Amino acid sequence: MEYNFREIEKKWQKIWVDNHTYQVNEDASKQKFYVLNMFPYPSGAGLHVGHPLGYIASDIYARYKRLQGFNVLNPMGYDAYGLPAEQYAIQTGQHPAITTVNNINRYREQLDKIGFSFDWNREIRTCDPEYYHWTQWAFIKMFNSYYCNDEKQARPIEELIEAFSTNGTQGMNVACGEEMDFTADEWNAKSEKEQQEILMNYRIAYLGNTMVNWCPALGTVLANDEVVDGVSERGGYPVIQKVMRQWCLRVSAYAQRLLDGLETVEWTDSLKETQRNWIGRSEGAEMNFKVKDSDIEFTIFTTRADTVFGVTFMVLAPESELVAKLTTPEQKAEVDAYLDRTKKRTERERIADRSVSGVFSGSYAINPLTNEPIPVWISDYVLAGYGTGAIMAVPAHDSRDYAFAKHFNLEIRPLIEGCDVSEESFDAKEGIMMNSPRPGAPEGGLVLNGLTVKEAIAKTKEYIKATGLGRVKVNFRLRDAIFSRQRYWGEPFPVYYKDGMPYMIDESCLPLELPEVAKFLPTETGEPPLGHATKWAWDTVNKCVTDNENIDNITIFPLELNTMPGFAGSSAYYLRYMDPRNHEALVSPAVDQYWKNVDLYVGGTEHATGHLIYSRFWNKFLHDWGISVAEEPFQKLVNQGMIQGRSNFVYRIKDTNTFVSLNLKDQYEVTPIHVDVNIVSNDILDLEAFKAWRPEYETAEFILEDGKYICGWAVEKMSKSMFNVVNPDMIVEKYGADTLRMYEMFLGPVEQSKPWDTNGIDGVHRFIKKFWSLFYDRNGEYLVKDEPATKEELKALHKLIKKVTGDIEQFSYNTSVSAFMICVNELSSLKCNKKEVLEQLIVVLAPFAPHVCEELWDTLGSTTSVCDAQWPAFNEQYLVEDTVNYTISFNGKARFNMEFPANAASDAIQATVLADERSLKWTEGKTPKKVIVVPKKIVNIVI
């Protein structure tokens, strides 16, 4: 019987669906294992061969763990909200819900063809109201919570309200936007609106004025990673910096826990370090500086309190509220022009760009230790979101301050003995202090001269704390997350507005569903697209959505017009997979206790500072409320590399429609042109297909070599514009899903990026055919016999089992594929057809090539799926070599080799070697001085 992969794969994909083969339920008798891929955004282009790489890798592992007896959860769903669907809707008028469903259906069709062991019973879509019910529910929880620094967890906001009404802010140690000070009487005297405004300073989900990346053309706020070189990643539209009132999540409250949690997870060191740097913990001090001839005072944060004597200027972030207060009338025009320029640069660009720019505010601050006046400048190298948005500049000991001082000819005052700051700053935290204070300064106060830097830092902190000039503080670079977007296609906020303040709708009324709108663009008055909705008001009496015309601001109020960002739906989806049809809770306690968290998470490193931070924060918040038993959502993380496109080029002779083959192109002046890789095979162009590809090539002529047109090639990002996108459907149709699965793994280590190159796919396909031929001959006769295996056959098998078991644990799938090829070659040479061997071979190969293995497993007479078999253990006794090859050397030079039984004694080996006629030749009749036998390696005869 011939290997007919089309029939086999279609047959088993249907059987898996009909028999619910991959459906899983909680089973207390089995140890659980939760495998998860970062779920895809269903774009209109569908999958290309790069997308399934991580899915295949995790699917192999999921199948392997099931064969080991684990109860494996391996779900899949869709991150279905997003900007592309909305942009398409704007262009075509087609509702995003329709295009999203169409795209999902296309993805599902493609995924099914590849043969994944997903439990589709648990499928989720973030745009499904049944799903975003729980996203809205979590948001309400966050709104109604504050973070207690003493207990290191979220607590109900009612506890804070009660504390304020009893003690005011006295004794409070809670996460907040700004520190407030009021008594219980002052709190109780405030109106409801005033109290709500104060509580916004403490809520975990809150409204705040933040600097955002605003894209006027798209009409929305963009995340930093959605902006490239000052324009939107999607569409290339200009982006400016703008202060807007936005919903935010107080992620910063969890900064230390996010750091600590990294010690408990199995992630790569590089990814952990990326998150540590993003969170950016720094220990330092806050110091207060007064403004000269003013009542204004502002605070700076510094990790080098010891350098306060070296401050020669102050710098404010352009977004700082202090800019307007400190800019003098004489400087206003210059400052306004500078602010206008900086608003076009994103924060990320400002961090990366080392060019110097700035403007003098016209004001001076007073150094609290020396009473010297210090000029206050404005520059975009200072960020509003880090520290206080103001810095004391010490150019002698900070490289960016140094560059600024050099550019604007400001004083540079060194504080470390012997340091040379003529060419660059001295940033090292080492040396002996000087100029602290400078010679001739008034006596009294803080003196650091003669101390080491470490001693000086400690002494300065103690001094400012004792004198009230500041305080010791730990600071984090991590910002609160902006959580609102001015778009249509996203989760609606369960929020209505009363007297300008936000209130939550009752949890019992969830989900609040996305309304229909006439247009997906902002309104003419600049409101988000939900401003077009005519039925978008909340009736607090009847607890339902009602027409806008009914708004009376007594019992019926306007609903929030913003929607949630893309990361809202992906922040807790792993929990919903555990219990996707539960209408009463995100996940039931019993189910949560069973699955706990994700044992293996597979996805790209590009999510290191986005999704992977937000999910960890979200999970820790839910953990505080007793909803997620595990504090960390993803125990082990594997980052798959990218499959790059292998582009092909044709070479057109300038000013002609003639194309010259690769190795002849240097004889002409040519222009390289990308050509569709689907009309190229092994770098040889299909000439007729090329002519039919585009009208302008219909009359093309060719200069060939040996009758063929050979294309050039390059490894580039896989994209439609380079015509190097390879559709997996084409590979599945031509070679089968099992070949695709094994070939993607064969390309190289999972974690590394590698080029897609079909030049080697035939070899993998031939391997599967050769594997098939162990069971059937060319005439279709079944070969398998129930006879004892030979020692050589068992050795080949157990060598494979040991190798593949270790490889799977290490995700070294490429070497596993090589091992399969070697083993099948060995068994073919041995003409092995023993059921004892082939049965175990099927099980070991099944995670990689499930369709063909199911078919052959069935032919062995099994009544269950190969998925329910048992992973074989390798037996070391079969791996012991019967004979050992010894190198025979004379005076250290290798001359020939001899085989000996593995258990041969040294005396016997020595006698046999000396009696060999080749030894007699090399000894020339002389008696050896010494014979050294190194067991299982070498015999060295010293003459």
From Swiss-Prot:
Q: Which reaction does it catalyse?
A: tRNA(Leu) + L-leucine + ATP = L-leucyl-tRNA(Leu) + AMP + diphosphate
**What's the top EC group for this one?**
ligase
Q: Which PANTHER family match?
A: LEUCINE--TRNA LIGASE, MITOCHONDRIAL, LEUCYL-TRNA SYNTHETASE
Disulfide bridge positions per record: none
Asked if the Swiss-Prot or TrEMBL record annotates the protein with the keyword Aminoacyl-tRNA synthetase, the reply is yes
**Protein name in the entry:** Leucine--tRNA ligase
The family note in this entry says: Belongs to the class-I aminoacyl-tRNA synthetase family.
Q: Where does ATP bind?
A: 720
NCBIfam families listed in its UniProt record: leuS_bact (TIGR00396)
For biological process, the GO terms are: leucyl-tRNA aminoacylation
Annotated motif 'KMSKS' region: location in the chain?
A: 717-721
What keywords is this UniProt entry annotated with? Aminoacyl-tRNA synthetase, ATP-binding, Cytoplasm, Ligase, Nucleotide-binding, Protein biosynthesis
Matching entries from HAMAP family are given as: Leu_tRNA_synth_B (MF_00049_B)
The Swiss-Prot or TrEMBL record annotates one GO molecular function as: ATP binding
Q: What is its EC number?
A: 6.1.1.4
